[in-house]
Amino acid sequence: CQSRREVNPGDDGVAISRVVETAASWDGAPLPSYPRGAPRVTILRATVPPHTALAMHTHALVNAGVILRGELTVIAETGAQRMFRAGEGIVELVGTRHYGENRGDGELELVMFYAGTQGMSLSERADL
């Protein structure tokens, strides 16, 4: 049996990097306060095929993620858009209609983290 060596962040062999820290979504809008109620954290891993757009939708809760592979372009109803590449963090729009699109030739893979309360929907479809 191998013995376990305990280390602290920053010790030899442990690398930590801040992907994103902000109080605003990717378009610069301030994030809302967290809702009151029993907390619920959800983490989703998504894979999006090449040349695929997700449906227009909104979020009522703060959510953020990391692009693991590929590129994600997010387009807001205002026309503002931004591309996120592998390794980059994204802080989503809250209360603004938007959609994501994989415009690349390879799969897009990302992990999203949602911070809400029991009973809150992660997103709502928002057709034009």
Model region roles, listed by residue range:
Residues 59-78, 88:
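Glycine- and acidic-residue-biased ligand/ion/polar-headgroup-sensing regions
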